[in-house]
Amino acid sequence: MSNLIISKKNEVYLHVDAEPHVYYELADQFTFELPDAKFMPQYKSKYWDGKIRLFNTQNGNIYVGLLDRIVQFCKDHEYTYEFQESEYYGLPFEVNDFISKEGVKDYMFSICKHSPREYQIEGVYDALRHNRKLLISPTASGKSLMIYSIVRYYVGRKQSILIVVPTTSLVEQMYKDFADYGWDVGSYCHKIYAGKERETDSQVIITTWQSIYKLPRKYFDRFSVVIGDEAHQFKSKSLVSIMGKLGDAKYRFGFTGTLSGSQTHKWVLEGLFGPSYKIIKTNELMKKGHVASLDINVLLLKHPPTRFETFEDEVQYIIGHNQRNNFIKNLALDLKGNTLILFARVEGHGEPLYNLINSNTVINRHVFFVHGGVATEDREQIREITESESDAIIVASYGTFSTGINIKNLHNVIFASPSKSRIRNLQSIGRVLRKGSNKTKATLYDIADDISYKSRRNYTLNHLIERIKVYNEENFNYDIVNIPLKK
């Protein structure tokens, strides 16, 4: 008899039948310390030990998407295993051998006005062949075409499809992309976000997760396909809850431009969607000419040495620094082309920056202010206006414009607020990489601050070091320019 007998409980969980000592070894293998746990209230109040446990020793359940990891565990520990077929859910591991790469290529060419690239065909082929996949593909690599191709495939097989995105803008954008590819999108797709009807007979639903995560399990019963765009956000409890309610969704596909770099993050997402597959890297897209080439100028503002007791003290100093804000204003007004300025705090930084820039610009030059309180329709209108402009400035919060918004005619991005988040930084860079009709090059201006006191580096300077690590990992070209700044 095998050491582990693995079966499907449903399309969310596997059940592992094994001896208690194997359960404890599996628990060790699939337990991780969350990198940011020490900052969380539950950890500080000692209600939680800061660990994520992906294997449940009480019932033997683990996410279906981690099957490959379990098989590797068996090999490493020299355990035997076997798959047991479920009457309703079938075998834990299935491969669709009838799907060929040539067939996928022909199909993608037949359903779209745009010619798919080789790596897009590879990604769709790998996804359809294995039923579930976490596809890692950077901004401007054509994720929406891959999603569209998968959607069309399952629509043709009469399956109900749920597409989950993080923002209302992305609901509208994906709907428009599908129409742009030549599909009669109105006959098949229904959009859900604030104020939209949730009940529909449409075969495809495109929705924000915020609109559906509180709905009962029964609502999700009809879906056999789930697609998560910007899947790196699916580690949150609300999104995990949605995926857990999709007990009959056999086909699961997550799309993201980047992961956080932590093993915990990757394994949770693989558990929800399936094994990860890296389609292509940004620097490869640049070499092939699919995206604009990128120059990064790190503008390191040198402040008088100052010691801050807390991170918040330093942030308040930075965002309220008049010379720093004037420097950003002058930079934005002097740059040629359309410019996106990203900030973290609306009232404390975004609004003062917008007022400063808008009051000093020439007449008829568009300066836009975008944050969470701006309606989706207004954001879309700003995007469309910018596409036809040559010197527009958008002052936007990271939350609204760092993820998924497509503006081809965008030439410059300014990081006005410090951030060490790998995902946020790479997604923000992605905003400027799309090629336009007269655009082949883009520039990122990374505003950083050296306020070091004696041998002690300031908090946000450490954030810059984390960003530079990312630039090196992605093989981006960057220069660091020191700029003295008076108090």
Predicted features, each with a name:
Residues 172, 188-200, 351-352, 365-402:
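Conserved helicase ATPase core of P-loop NTP-dependent helicases/translocases
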Residues 306-344, 348-359:
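Conserved interdomain hinge at the start of the Helicase C-terminal
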Residues 168-193, 360-361:
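Conserved helix-turn-beta segment of the N-terminal RecA-like "Helicase ATP-binding" lobe
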Residues 225, 232-295, 471:
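Post-DEXD/H (motif II) to motif III coupling segment of the RecA-like Helicase ATP-binding lobe
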